[in-house]
Amino acid sequence: VFNPHPVDIKTNEQKGTFPSRRAAVAADNCSDMIFKNITFKTDCKGQAEGFLLNGERNYAENVHVIGDGDALQVNGSAYWLNCVVDGGGDTVLGRGPSYFNHCTLSSYGAFMWIRNTKENHGNIFNDCTFKGLGQDAVIARLPDNKGKNYPDAECVLLNCTLDGVPVEGFGPVAETASTANLLEFNSHDKEGMTIDISRRNKHVRQLDAIKDAETIGKYSNASWVLNW
């Protein structure tokens, strides 16, 4: 599904407008759609989406997305179940909100560059697996971007498996994004052993099963995250 737009509009600059010319598959301003049992793939390198999705209340199940930078870009609410995303870096990009349930992601660089505003949640991962394929495969990064950042960005990991992810987990996170909501609960390695969080990025907050039970419960609820 393709919706052309002015060439002077940059990615994520305005809601509903982004350059879909580089994506293998682009669903632009599409809502209430279901994507099941399908693979979206591009062989292009650089900023090359396998799948670019813009819209509200979209659902994906057993979808395999293969790209390079920005392999999966999502702008608008979407639920992902048993999906696989393979990318080169900033593998999941966009404004969200996205709820990932039992998904597997692999990346050579950072898994995410989160860009949601305070208007909605960001990227939430429940029982997902992250496979880092390179030394820079942090979960998410928030560097200054040409004088701009995303202070309301949100990334939450619940009961996730981390394999090949650097000990700092997240980063770099510039001070201009120090208010980002980066939460982690019960991350473990592929053997099920608790991850060493002693050297985690200072901007990441670890959730406690008892003290933060209410917060964990909310983020475990996809309807609450997506406002569906």
Identify the function of each model-found stretch.
Residues 1-228:
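Sequence-level preference for short, compositionally simple segments enriched
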